[in-house]
Amino acid sequence: MHSFKHERRRISSKLADATLTTGGSPEGIDYSPVAMMPDVRVLKIGGQSVMDRGRAAVFPILDEVVAAKDKHKLLLCCGGGTRARHIYSIASDLELPTGVLAALGGYVPRQNARMLQMLLAKHGGLFIMNDDFEKLPLYFRLGCIPIMTGMPPFGYWEKPTKGGRIPENRTDAGVFLTAE
């Protein structure tokens, strides 16, 4: 039998010996976020405030988006609206956990984003998933109007909400995080 002596390799890093669970930045780490795409305008198309109102509300907004698309880089994010609230109500009544509600509620804003993509297809409307976010510079160079769900991608891993099951992080939070 061979006897091997294994030495633990050490990688020099400011975070190597830091605890990352206490919050804040470890000493000596400066944090200054880089604005990845500062010229992009993120617009939320609300589920209840716009999509649920149908053609009379949606079409004038899309006309404005099309008129602005050549002047600005626009990323559209969609809310869920009444249908998402209905899903939350049923799933809560069935006593499903918060993560399941987040996953189920995320389907509705995705449906809304797909509808907008179809309506904007002739103008470069393009449905994208959260994982396509890194491709935004390419889509903008091609003259596209990227459209995505406003729901953050936590899904089943959404933290339980104090005093209820409705996910705290819904489309308003997702659009904010996207814009950040």
Residue ranges and their predicted role:
Residues 40-44, 75-77, 145-149, 155:
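Structural motif
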Residues 49-51, 81-85, 154-155:
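Short, active-site-adjacent cap segments at secondary-structure transitions
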Residues 56-61, 168-174:
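Charged helix-capping and loop-helix junction motifs
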Residues 72-73, 77-80, 84:
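Glycine/small-residue-rich interface belts in oligomeric ring/scaffold proteins
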Residues 88-170, 178:
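Ligand-binding beta-strand-loop-alpha-helix segment within the catalytic cores
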